């Protein structure tokens, strides 16, 4: 007889299944909630559409690519990228015409960096360089015979383990973890493989291979920096520092001198290295070329330069010193902690444990004021020559190795017929110089224009500083054949000569006195020309006699405090807006600022600051927005049905009355999405048929490496190389290339270009910024911006403002003079907006004084919009962590209230909870709601005039769709929920069955 199944069996099985399905269901629900909360980031990562377009018109193309295929586009990108490095690389030294090398030269590539060339910096600006050639390949492509034994030694042999830290694509993190790690010279005696030995006679070790490839040693000296931390300027244990040669590198150069006919050094760095070694006979360097970071194709251009196929025409964008610590800005460069930091409730202002504000308990002082880079080195030099009081011990010749603007060529040029005059009708000066190629090869020449303004008793009495010379114009010739000439003409608006008087006139003034304009090869030659015009010679201590024939004197009879007090861009009055940068604003004593009236007595020193109650009010993140007392603002109309679409607004003025009709349709929730979730996009607004956009990074060309969804068509050389070209036409072409790349990849917004200042050589993000000079930075930025935006891309120029340090950069308080901020740190942004037409801005983490830059109305509204006329929108830097107190959204979103009321429009976040917080907190507040409406206006206006509207007409509609992954997650949750319910049902059923079975088999109570 078959045995029946025991009732109630399976309890253990269904218990296990119930627990398993419950755990899976709980995990799925948590995962789904997290994904839904960060839906925007997920959509970006998966390239998932959130809407579909109805009524799209493919003939409605407002911005069109210049290319019919990706192959054509990428070929043109490559050509321009190579030209960029070819014109930006700077020839520093070329003794005995070492360069160019003879065709077919047998060369050895020394340094591990030869096989690990730095193509970009670290962090969000990291680029895809998968198309970049190796250095060996680039050299072989132009006909050089490269030492294979040495190359194999670095790639597969004993030298492969000596790797630089950090490597590309990583964060700098802790500065103490920074290592150059060059291969010790002793390792070159390592025995080689049999195959390598067979490649040449008498090759037994790596060093013995040099004889067969001894025409030249090409030494690659690389330094990498980037987002997250500044370089350490203190000495390593061996007495060297990160921007000087290490002992291993010194030994390597000595070895090269012994073994090779000539030594060529390539400086693969955007942080100015100390150049004391280049002319030291101990190392025997015959030629040196600065190449910056090379991007995808820059190495091809470098090889072309060495071969003579390209004549270098770049000029330095920074002052290169023998000792970088001579810069006054380094005295107080790194962050200082408030002296009463430990006495306070640090949770109020410091939350690094939660990924928050590492700089909110810190401050920095720019005591050097305007004296950044050559503005310091050349000014103090002139004061020494003129015998100014209190100039101190200062020897220019032993301090500066290569001045700002320096650059050599393979040919020679003669300048003549300098002309300059003032044109009252245009209120500008015209400068012209005839340039003739007097050498034997074709080349391009750069003419730089500088001015000097009078340093008066009024200046000394009222805290106005004047640099000895300032760049005010430049021009570059076409490629001139030997014997060919060209007249270079430079226009200099007289407004360039004005200075900012923050203490008395509180605006820009043009003082009475003599102004000098000169054409020069570099900043030092400019000073010498002016000194010559004043009657000084080498007998007075000049490094060389200047040429007074290349100077022009303009005399301004009366101090003018009116003409330049009105913005030429908007007609608005220009006056002080940045009082919070002055320590007296918070009740402290006046900060000592470096002055040329007393170099020795005002040299910067570390300042100890105790955070007082006034300062704590501004830096305390845990505050609640309580509304505006006495406000009469009315709630705007929202959610109306006016039949408007964004397509109807294409090409209309910002102040067109139809904008109000359109904005009346937008709901509060949609405004909150635009304001609160600006991470790499602008959100869809279905009520007005606005599509979502894709926005991403791009100091070296459009890159999506941060979001990981695509590669770029081309990665260009760094911004230092861009500026070093001194070629605005080329930079506009680079911009057009980037715009075409973005059109093809379906992107509308670019987080860049960046244009902060090289305050010192040690800033982590100098590779993202053009120069130490704001005029050059602004002109190059304006050209690049104009080119990019010609393809319907809106650029976010960044980081606005004072983001000149990486260490403790998140909400560090910055103190300096308004003159320094306006003349040095804002000027590049101003030029990019007023001349380049930049549409958007990315704010900085930094504080101006104690006020976060994004909440500083003087900066974001009065200067950016009032004085400069920006009509687009501004976005915060990354604010994706709720711990970004007073920066990201925190308790009761106080910083969002501050930011919106000051003029910030969108937060670089993808967190759904932030949008919800906005909706919950401010929905009944008319002032905040009106600010959100204006932010929405700016964003919609920008997008309406971008390539995002290609295919859109007045009749085009946007319909929201549920992303596939949301449907999939919901299905998974439902299925797991059903399985949990089913397993519980079966478990209960089995338990009941088992109990019933036990009851049937149990003996009766009276049964014996």
Give the positions of each predicted feature.
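Glycoside hydrolase catalytic-domain context in secreted enzymes
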Residues: 1-500, 509-517, 523, 572-1008
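Terminal connector regions
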Residues: 494-565
């Amino acid at each position: 007889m078959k045995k029946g199944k025991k009732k109630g069996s399976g309890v253990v099985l269904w218990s296990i299944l119930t627990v398993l399905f419950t755990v899976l269901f709980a995990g799925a629900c948590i995962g789904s909630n997290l994904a839904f909360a960060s839906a925007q980031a997920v959509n970006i990562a998966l390239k998932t559409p959130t809407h579909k377009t109805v009524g799209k018109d493919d003939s409605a193309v407002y911005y069109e690519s210049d290319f019919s295929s990706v192959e054509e586009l990428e070929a043109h990108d490559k050509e321009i990228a190579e030209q960029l490095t070819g014109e930006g690389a700077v020839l520093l030294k070329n003794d005995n015409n070492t360069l160019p090398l003879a065709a077919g030269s047998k060369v050895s590539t020394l340094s591990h960096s030869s096989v690990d060339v730095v193509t970009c910096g670290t962090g969000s600006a990291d680029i895809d360089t998968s198309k970049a050639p190796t250095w060996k390949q680039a050299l072989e492509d132009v006909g050089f015979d490269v030492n294979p034994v040495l190359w194999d030694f670095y790639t597969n042999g004993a030298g492969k383990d000596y790797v630089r830290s950090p490597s590309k694509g990583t964060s700098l993190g802790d500065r103490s973890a920074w290592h150059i790690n060059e291969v010790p010279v002793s390792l070159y005696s390592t025995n080689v493989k049999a195959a390598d030995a067979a490649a040449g006679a008498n090759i037994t070790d790596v060093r013995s291979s040099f004889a067969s490839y001894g025409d030249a040693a090409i030494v690659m000296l690389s330094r990498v920096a980037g987002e997250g931390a500044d370089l350490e300027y203190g000495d390593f244990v061996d007495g060297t520092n990160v921007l000087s040669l290490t002992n291993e590198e010194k030994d390597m150069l000595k070895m090269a001198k012994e073994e090779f006919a000539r030594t060529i050094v390539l400086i693969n760095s955007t942080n100015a290295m100390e150049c004391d070694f280049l002319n030291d006979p101990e190392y025997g360097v015959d030629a040196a070329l600065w190449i910056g970071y090379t991007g995808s194709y820059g190495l091809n251009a470098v090889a072309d330069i060495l071969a003579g196929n390209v004549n270098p025409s770049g000029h330095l964008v920074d002052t290169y010193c023998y000792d970088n610590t001579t810069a006054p800005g380094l005295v107080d460069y790194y962050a200082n902690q408030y002296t009463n930091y430990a006495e306070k409730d640090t949770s109020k202002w410091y939350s690094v444990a939660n990924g928050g504000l590492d700089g909110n308990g810190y401050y920095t002082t720019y005591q050097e004021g305007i004296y950044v880079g050559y503005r310091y080195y050349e000014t103090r030099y002139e004061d020494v020559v003129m015998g100014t009081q209190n100039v101190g011990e200062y020897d220019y010749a032993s301090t500066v190795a290569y001045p700002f603007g320096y650059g050599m060529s393979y040919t020679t040029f003669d300048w003549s017929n300098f002309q300059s005059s003032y044109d009252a009708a245009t209120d500008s000066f015209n400068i012209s110089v005839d340039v003739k190629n007097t050498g034997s090869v074709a080349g391009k020449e750069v003419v730089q224009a500088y001015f000097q303004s009078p340093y008066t008793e009024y200046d000394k009495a009222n805290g106005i500083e004047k640099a000895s010379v300032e760049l005010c114009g430049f021009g570059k010739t076409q490629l001139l054949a030997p014997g060919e000439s060209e007249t270079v003409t430079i226009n200099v608006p007289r407004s360039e000569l004005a200075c900012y008087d923050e203490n008395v006139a509180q605006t820009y003034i043009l003082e009475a006195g003599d102004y000098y304009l000169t054409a020069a090869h570099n900043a030092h030659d400019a000073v010498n020309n002016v000194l010559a015009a004043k009657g000084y010679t080498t007998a007075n201590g000049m490094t060389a006699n200047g040429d007074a024939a290349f100077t022009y004197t303009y005399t301004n009879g009366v101090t003018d405090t009116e003409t330049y007090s009105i913005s030429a861009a908007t007609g608005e009055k220009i006056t002080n807006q940045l009082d919070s940068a002055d320590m007296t604003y918070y009740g402290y004593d006046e900060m000592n600022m470096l002055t040329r009236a007393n170099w020795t007595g005002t040299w910067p020193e570390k300042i100890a600051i105790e955070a007082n109650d006034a300062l704590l009010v501004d830096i305390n993140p845990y505050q609640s927005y309580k509304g505006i007392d006495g406000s009469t603002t009315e709630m705007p109309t929202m959610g109306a049905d006016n039949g408007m679409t964004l397509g109807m607004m294409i090409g209309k003025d910002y102040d067109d009355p139809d904008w109000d009709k359109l904005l009346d349709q937008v709901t509060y929730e949609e405004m909150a999405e635009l304001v609160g979730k600006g991470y790499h996009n602008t959100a869809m607004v279905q009520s007005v048929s606005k599509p979502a956009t894709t926005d991403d990074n791009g100091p070296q060309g459009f890159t999506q490496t941060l979001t990981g969804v695509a590669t770029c068509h081309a990665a260009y050389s760094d911004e230092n190389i861009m500026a070093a070209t001194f070629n605005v036409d080329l930079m506009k072409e680079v911009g057009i290339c980037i715009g075409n790349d973005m059109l093809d990849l379906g992107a509308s917004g670019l987080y860049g270009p960046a244009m902060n200042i090289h305050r010192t050589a040690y800033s982590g993000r100098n590779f993202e910024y053009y120069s130490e000079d704001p005029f050059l930075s602004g002109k190059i930025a304006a050209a690049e911006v104009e080119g990019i935006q010609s393809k319907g891309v809106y650029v976010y120029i960044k980081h606005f403002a004072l983001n000149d340090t990486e260490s403790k950069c998140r909400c560090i308080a910055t103190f300096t003079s308004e003159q320094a901020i306006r003349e040095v740190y804002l000027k590049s942004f101003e030029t990019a907006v007023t001349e380049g037409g930049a549409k958007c801005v990315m704010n900085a983490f930094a504080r101006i004084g104690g006020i976060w830059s994004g909440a500083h109305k003087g900066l974001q509204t009065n200067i950016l919009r009032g004085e400069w006329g920006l009509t687009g929108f501004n976005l915060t830097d990354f604010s994706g962590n709720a711990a970004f107190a007073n920066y990201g959204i925190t308790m009761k979103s106080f910083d969002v209230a501050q930011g919106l009321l000051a003029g910030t429009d969108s937060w670089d976040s993808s967190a759904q909870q932030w949008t919800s917080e906005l909706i919950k907190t401010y929905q009944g507040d008319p002032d905040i709601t009106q600010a959100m409406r204006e932010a929405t206006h700016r964003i919609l206006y920008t997008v309406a005039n971008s390539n995002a509207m290609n295919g859109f007409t007045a009749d085009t509609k946007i319909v929201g769709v549920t992303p596939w992954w949301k449907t999939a997650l919901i299905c998974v949750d439902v299925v797991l929920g059903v399985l949990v319910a089913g397993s519980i049902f079966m478990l209960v059923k089995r338990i009941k069955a088992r109990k019933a079975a036990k009851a049937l088999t149990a003996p009766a109570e009276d049964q014996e």
